[in-house]
């Protein structure tokens, strides 16, 4: 399938269905050459790029395609194999690599795949670099090819996951263990299926694993951070202390308390922000949240004297606002949490360790830590769409939004936006009465589906 390759990058790298543009082998080879071209523009000479992936079946072909493009331009590549996205960011820094590449479509189904690119400092590349890569791919002008003796070598790094495991454990206080904790862990059959059980078990927790048998086609399938109902049931069944659900590439975290209640990213951010403030480790008493963050959570944080900077949805925007405001903690409802004291991107395993540390140090259950946070009633519905038409151009949609806003008045809010990574329109309604919020959200969903819907919403 062909597509204009002048715009490859979305809100989180390149993403799409495998074997459809832009996620084809042909375009991936060009991307590899373009990444090399950008590095060589900065300075000539030897360069090193690390390449990791999640467990999708298509990961093999994209790994080989990217490496072919990179090595053809004289770049040395290091294959990490299956490893979480934050692991690639960490290894990029640890190996003093010039760039890191993660092959993953994160929480998307197995049929999709994607490419995330990190600079040498472990942060995702910015828009200017993305645009330069796109220009090179479109023009196919990558610079001079090296002589035959100067093409790049490819090596497999055998201890990449071991290094990441040790790094993750090092974020947990020395002298403390997880002894006595029974943890239900769901790795979504994804990139954390080896490293996450090892991290928690080596810290002496009892770990009951779900989603740790990847087939290449079962990543995120009814499991992981997008399907916490799996561990809700398991926590009760196994009488566990806590449940931990990660997504396919390991940068999201959703938890479940000992009573089987879901603790989402908003709640986890509140727990960690409160702890950092108590320890005087929260600069300017500031955290970064998003427009999706529950009003009840915002009120709770403000009651603690914590300032909240609001960013658009997406970990790139959260990180940008963190850097601009010198914040060390930011996160979003979906479970992305960034601890800049530890890593340069969202890290589900490290985030879980911080929550577990707080539980242990405060001698509290997870339900104890959330008891004082009262969330506002909120409905969030994902509507599959056929195309992303500008919402302001849809008269019927704008009409129903106006009607719902009049019903809510000043006591609620509506957020309607397209996903940056999927053909989905997200409908969020928040108010004071749960039944009213659900009903109003359904009213909006019905109109959106009638206008641009592609199937059953969820």
Swiss-Prot record:
Keywords: Isomerase, Magnesium, Metal-binding, Phosphoprotein. Its EC number is 5.4.2.10. InterPro entries: A-D-PHexomutase_a/b/a-I (IPR005844), A-D-PHexomutase_a/b/a-I/II/III (IPR016055), A-D-PHexomutase_a/b/a-II (IPR005845), A-D-PHexomutase_a/b/a-III (IPR005846), A-D-PHexomutase_C (IPR005843), A-D-PHexomutase_C_sf (IPR036900), A-D-PHexomutase_CS (IPR016066), Alpha-D-phosphohexomutase_SF (IPR005841). It catalyses: alpha-D-glucosamine 1-phosphate = D-glucosamine 6-phosphate. Signal peptide: none annotated. GO terms for molecular function: magnesium ion binding; phosphoglucosamine mutase activity; phosphomannomutase activity. Activated by phosphorylation. Binds 1 Mg(2+) ion per subunit. The active site is at residue 106. Mg(2+) binds at residues 106, 247, 249, 251. One of its GO terms (biological process) is UDP-N-acetylglucosamine biosynthetic process. The modification Phosphoserine is found at residue 106. Its cofactor is Mg(2+). Belongs to the phosphohexose mutase family. Catalyzes the conversion of glucosamine-6-phosphate to glucosamine-1-phosphate. This is Phosphoglucosamine mutase. It comes from Chlamydia trachomatis serovar L2 (strain ATCC VR-902B / DSM 19102 / 434/Bu).
């Amino acid at each position: 399938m062909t597509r204009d390759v002048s715009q490859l990058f979305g809100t989180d790298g390149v993403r799409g269905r495998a074997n459809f543009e832009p996620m084809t082998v042909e375009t991936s080879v060009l991307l590899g050459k373009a990444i090399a071209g950008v590095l060589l523009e900065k300075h000539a000479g030897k360069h090193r790029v690390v390449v990791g992936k999640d467990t999708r079946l298509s990961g093999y072909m994209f790994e080989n395609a990217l490496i072919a493009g990179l090595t053809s331009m004289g770049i040395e590549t290091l294959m990490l194999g299956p490893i979480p996205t934050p692991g690639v960011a960490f290894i990029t820094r640890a190996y003093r690599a010039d760039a890191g590449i993660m092959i993953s479509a994160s929480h998307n189904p197995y049929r999709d795949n994607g490419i995330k690119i990190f600079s040498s400092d472990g942060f995702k590349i910015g828009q200017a670099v993305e645009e330069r890569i796109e220009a090179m791919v479109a023009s196919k002008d990558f610079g001079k090819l090296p002589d035959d003796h100067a093409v790049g070598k490819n090596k497999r790094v055998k201890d990449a996951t071991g290094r990441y495991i040790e790094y993750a454990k090092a974020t947990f206080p020395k002298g403390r263990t997880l002894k006595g904790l029974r943890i239900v862990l769901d790795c979504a059959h994804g990139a954390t299926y080896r490293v996450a059980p090892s991290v928690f078990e080596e810290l002496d927790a009892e770990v009951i694993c779900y989603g740790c048998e990847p087939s290449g086609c079962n990543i995120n399938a009814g499991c992981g951070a997008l399907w916490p109902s799996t561990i809700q049931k398991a926590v009760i069944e196994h009488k566990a202390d806590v449940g931990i659900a990660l997504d396919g590439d390991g940068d999201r975290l959703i938890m479940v308390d000992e009573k089987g209640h879901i603790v989402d990213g908003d709640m986890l951010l509140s727990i960690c922000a409160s702890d950092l403030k108590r320890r005087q480790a929260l600069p300017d008493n500031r955290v970064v949240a998003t427009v999706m963050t529950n009003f009840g959570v915002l009120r709770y944080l403000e009651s603690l004297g914590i300032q909240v900077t609001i960013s658009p949805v997406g970990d790139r925007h959260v990180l940008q606002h963190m850097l601009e405001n010198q914040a060390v903690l930011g996160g979003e409802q979906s479970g992305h949490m960034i601890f800049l004291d530890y890593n340069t991107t969202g890290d589900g395993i490290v985030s879980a360790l911080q929550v577990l540390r707080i539980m242990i140090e405060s001698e509290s259950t997870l339900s104890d830590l959330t008891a004082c946070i009262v969330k506002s009633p909120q409905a969030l519905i994902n509507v599959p769409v056929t195309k992303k038409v500008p919402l302001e151009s849809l008269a019927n949609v704008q009409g129903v939004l106006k009607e719902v806003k009049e019903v809510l008045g000043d006591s609620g809010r509506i957020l309607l936006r397209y996903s940056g990574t999927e053909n989905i329109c997200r409908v969020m309604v928040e108010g004071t009465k749960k039944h009213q919020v659900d009903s109003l959200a359904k009213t909006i969903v019905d109109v959106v589906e009638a206008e641009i819907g592609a199937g059953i919403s969820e």
